[in-house]
């Protein structure tokens, strides 16, 4: 930050007016970690907390990282030791006095959260966030499209490295009613199709047996890859820029897991 003395807690307070922490799942780590009263120099915004992202923050003199996904810290406990798989990264964060803000399911479940942001970027109309399942947003396209067409739009808008869909539905060209669940949402598929009579559900992270299940139920699903959630970076960047104006010194990090497909 340049002109104003802004604390990490100030930024959290601003963001949580739109993305209420009370909406977060009980198992999820949302909120501010490490030093809430730290005066912020610069801010790094990312999808995940990785070594590359932390290095970017250090390079940019950023002492606050805002991420969608919490720092991965699987813990194995016994009577003698607590072992965190990311202990080296945690130590690097502490050494460089970097605070963290995570907005995961608190962001996803908000009225203008992940699925709603995705639906708007795809140009869906008559948008509705489901009252029973806040992660589900349903909308419509003015003109019917094919799976192939909407997949290409998703890849362009969300920077998804790979899009998957069942070839059974490839020839259908009048798909209009679409449900979106950002992240891993296949477990909600049955409910979404049954209550909304969807032509298509767009989500991520389907496993082999999920595809078998979806085909047996004649459910048309697009797997847009979890990296599609990288739109979080732009959303938070824009929100902070509008609020803080020239006082904000914001940086973006997109850390992509490099997986080869043969």
Swiss-Prot record:
Q: What is the protein name stated in its UniProt record? A: GTP cyclohydrolase 1 type 2 homolog
Keywords tagged on the record:
Metal-binding
> Which Gene3D superfamilies is this protein grouped with?
NIF3 (NGG1p interacting factor 3)-like
Q: Which residues cross the membrane?
A: none
Q: Which molecular function term from Gene Ontology is one that the record holds?
A: metal ion binding
- Where on this chain does a divalent metal cation 1 bind? 68, 108, 229
Q: Which family does it belong to?
A: Belongs to the GTP cyclohydrolase I type 2/NIF3 family.
Fill in the subunit field for this protein.
Homohexamer.
| GO CC aspect terms | cytoplasm
The record, for InterPro entries, names: DUF34/NIF3, DUF34/NIF3_sf
Q: Quote the record's binding site residues for a divalent metal cation 2.
A: 69, 226, 229
């Amino acid at each position: 930050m340049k002109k104003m003395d802004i604390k990490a807690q100030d930024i959290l307070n601003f963001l949580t007016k739109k993305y209420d922490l009370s909406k977060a799942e009980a198992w999820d780590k949302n909120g501010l970690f490490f030093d809430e009263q730290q005066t912020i120099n610069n801010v790094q915004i990312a999808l995940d907390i990785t070594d590359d992202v932390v290095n970017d923050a250090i390079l940019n003199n950023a002492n606050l990282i805002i991420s969608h996904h919490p720092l991965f810290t699987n813990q194995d406990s016994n009577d003698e030791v607590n072992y965190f798989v990311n202990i080296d990264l945690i130590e690097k964060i502490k050494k460089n006095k970097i605070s963290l803000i995570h907005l995961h399911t608190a962001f996803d479940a908000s009225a203008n959260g992940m699925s709603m942001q995705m639906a708007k970027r795809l140009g869906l109309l008559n948008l509705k966030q489901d009252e029973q399942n806040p992660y589900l947003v349903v909308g419509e396209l003015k003109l019917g499209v094919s799976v192939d067409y909407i997949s290409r739009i998703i890849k362009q808008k969300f920077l998804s490295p790979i899009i998957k869909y069942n070839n059974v539905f490839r020839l259908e060209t009048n798909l209009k009613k679409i449900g979106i669940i950002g992240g891993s949402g296949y477990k909600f598929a049955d409910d979404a199709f049954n209550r909304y009579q969807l032509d298509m559900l767009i989500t991520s992270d389907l496993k082999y047996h999920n595809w078998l299940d979806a085909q047996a139920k004649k459910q048309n699903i697009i797997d847009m890859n979890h990296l599609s959630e990288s739109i979080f970076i732009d959303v938070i960047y824009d929100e902070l820029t509008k609020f803080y104006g020239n006082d904000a010194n914001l940086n973006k990090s997109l850390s992509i897991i490099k997986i080869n497909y043969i």
